[in-house]
Regions:
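Short, glycine/serine-rich, charged loops/turns that create anion-binding
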Residues: 22, 42, 128
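N-terminal G-site helix/loop of the GST-like fold
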Residues: 16-39
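Short, acidic/turn-prone active-site loops that include or flank metal/cofactor-
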Residues: 39-45
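Anionic-ligand binding patches
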Residues: 13-16, 29, 53-173
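Intrinsic-disorder-associated, low-complexity terminal segments enriched in Asp/Asn/His/Tyr and depleted
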Residues: 1-4
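Short, basic/glycine-rich phosphate-binding loops at helix/coil junctions
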Residues: 45-48, 85-87
Length: 173
């Protein structure tokens, strides 16, 4: 019989979340991770425009990496976590809504339809990628009435503009 001993590690590493997203911060907090936050200097729209060859599945991993590397360049001593999520329906990538009218339009386009949420994570240290992961979730939005949509938008308020597709699966749905 082999005996295993737990080893303690005295190495302390600063973890930085390359995002100011309250949802991402809550996920790390709930996981018991001590971290700081930094807003990455990444223009997502410019990156997308500069890379027309990107397929829908390329976008979230590329943006997560860009965010992690941008902050890692400023804090090479830290482990930097970059994240991104895209919503894909019928080969179209949905971005965060520009305004409430755009959110209403996006939600109407998803009504009663299946779509994919593609989430990507990237860790960087010393300006290099040390780990990455991405996953997809297939979801179907239920059919709903115009009155329901009005109530939903009223309940979410400004939060409707902070997430792709205009909905938060981790909250109201």
């Amino acid at each position: 019989d082999r005996q295993y001993r737990k080893r303690s590690c005295d190495v302390q590493m600063t973890v930085i979340l390359a995002s100011t997203s309250p949802t991402r911060q809550l996920l790390l907090t709930n996981a018991g991770v001590s971290f700081a936050t930094a807003r990455p200097d990444v223009d997502e729209n410019r990156l997308r425009s500069a890379n027309p060859q990107w397929r829908p599945d390329d976008v979230a991993p590329a943006l997560a990496q860009a965010k992690a590397l941008a902050v890692s360049g400023l804090r090479p001593d830290a482990l930097v976590l970059g994240a991104d999520q895209t919503l894909i329906c019928d080969h179209r990538i949905y971005a965060k809504p520009l305004d409430v009218a755009d959110a209403r339009k996006q939600l109407a386009a998803l009504r009663g339809r299946s779509h994919t949420l593609h989430s990507a994570l990237c860790c960087a240290r010393n300006g290099s990628v040390v780990w990455r992961h991405d996953a997809r979730a297939e979801l179907t939005m239920r059919d709903w009435s115009p009155a329901f949509l009005d109530q939903y938008i009223a309940k979410l308020g400004g939060d409707i503009l902070t997430t792709v597709g205009g909905y938060k699966v981790e909250e109201l749905g």
